[in-house]
Regions:
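Acidic, metal-coordinating catalytic cores used for nucleic-acid/nucleotide bond scission
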Residues: 80-90
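NTP-dependent small-molecule kinase module
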Residues: 2-6, 141-201
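A glycine- and Lys/Arg-enriched "phosphate-lid" helix/loop adjacent to the NTP-binding pocket
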Residues: 97-151
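Conserved glycine(s) of the Walker
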Residues: 20
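Hydrophobic anchor at the beta1->P-loop junction of P-loop NTPases
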Residues: 13
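Walker A (P-loop) ATP-phosphate-binding motif of ABC ATPase nucleotide-binding domains
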Residues: 10
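Conserved substrate/cofactor phosphate-moiety recognition/catalytic segment
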Residues: 23-76
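The conserved Walker
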Residues: 16-17
Length: 201
């Protein structure tokens, strides 16, 4: 059954590897013909065939922003499938050139032991979890957040039903008039560029 989304959405997924981000993103676009997914890891691999951080992370994120804004201009809601571990990256992905867009940061919450088990099953070890621990930040500021638990398929389905209800709602606390952009897009872009330079000199 499809999702009858109300309004235009820019949704950013943030979560550890194997937390269910891609499954959620693909579910959203499968159930709504006016949703489009941008996969950060897939774009990075397509351009450079490299794991993060690749040789030009700023180019990757600049292209993501351009694709996002082009899709929004064509009246497609966007879901950005990313790890987005820090607040500058989250803010960059949430800040659109187009106004009157519902912004939403979905934090994928999975218990650590479940994350470790899934990563060992997929990659053979839990090094990815440890690596992202060093960069992970709690969200701050006036950021609309939906916390999505995904420890099991039953829990995933329960939270997906809640998310679907939100997206179909006429009135919700994530409307653009209830939130201000803390910085213009140009300034957020510069902040991300500086962050990436420090991380990958």
């Amino acid at each position: 059954m499809g999702v009858a989304v109300k309004g235009l959405w820019n949704i950013v997924l943030s979560g550890y590897p194997r937390s269910g981000k891609t499954m959620l993103a693909k579910r959203l676009i499968a159930e709504n013909q006016y949703f489009a997914r941008i996969g950060v890891d897939e774009l990075r691999e397509m351009l450079f065939n490299e794991a993060p951080p690749c040789r030009d992370e700023f180019l990757v994120y600049s292209m993501i922003a351009d694709m996002r804004d082009s899709l929004l201009e064509k009246s497609y809601s966007v879901v950005i499938d990313s790890t987005a571990p820090d607040n500058i990256t989250r803010q960059f992905l949430l800040t659109t050139r187009r106004k009157r867009v519902n912004r939403l940061l979905i934090m994928l919450n999975v218990d650590r032991e479940v994350l470790v088990e899934r990563n060992i099953e997929k990659f053979g070890d839990a090094s990815a979890v440890v690596a992202w621990d060093k960069r992970w930040q709690k969200p701050v500021g006036d950021v609309p957040i939906f916390r999505f638990k995904s420890n099991s398929m039953e829990e995933f389905e329960s939270y997906y039903a809640r998310l679907k209800e939100l997206l179909e709602s006429e009135m919700h606390p994530f409307k653009p008039e209830f939130h201000r952009f803390p910085m213009p897009f140009r300034d957020v872009r510069e902040a991300l560029k500086n962050l990436l330079k420090k991380r990958n000199p």
